[in-house]
Amino acid sequence: MTLDLDANKKDDKILITTIQQEYKILAEYKMIESEKLGGIYTIPSLANSLQWFGVFFGRQGLYSESVFRFSLLLPDRFPDDKSLPTVIFQQNILHPHVCPYTNSLDISHAFPEWRCGEDHLWQLFKYMQAIFSDPIDSIRGIEMDKIKNPEAAELLLTNREEFAARVLENIKESKEHIYDPQPTEDPHYIVFEKFQPDVHGPVLERIKAGRNNQTDSTLQQTNGGTATGLSWVKEGEFKPLSIE
């Protein structure tokens, strides 16, 4: 009888810990939403909240026009664990902070360890935006042997034209596979569809109409109103259209 009670208490403790962790992860997701990170779309897997799906859209610099899929893997005890989250891109990317063998992103220069309550996932994504916007600045002050891909760093510093050409190859390759069949049945996996006028046309028109009305609504927003809307991908391109 005592053994049964101890087992029940242990099960209850595990359940409570799991529920608390789920709430903390949900809070992280809500913070990402509130930050309105332009060019980064991410969502936890329905099957496992420790695994997230994501897409990065480059908006400026050498990586502008890029569309890179990535996975975000959280440690088992996140966010209480000091271990860092893992970002793994689904394609080869030439960048000083991306491992050429595993496609994993090195975030240790910004986050030596994960500090619960101080470090948040939206900050990680902000860092991702920054290092792709200005890769040269991202390696400034870092010793070459501490960089995940020193060959990429050396090429960036000594032959920027060649570096840019190889990055363009990465971008082209990623776009060629953007419509590939999804590798998982998880309904939260981010899927791209080719533009279909009968399906997506009405949505695009609503977006255009909303943008035309933005000027008229500016005064209302200043007085406390908010504007919301839909996002989509422009026909023939990979730029997200959005009303925020």
Curated annotation (Swiss-Prot):
Matches recorded under CDD domains: UEV_AKTIP
InterPro entries given in the database record: UBQ-conjugat_E2_core, UBQ-conjugating_enzyme/RWD
Stretches assigned to the UBC core domain: 20-176
Family according to the record: Belongs to the ubiquitin-conjugating enzyme family. FTS subfamily.
Name this protein carries in UniProt: Protein crossbronx
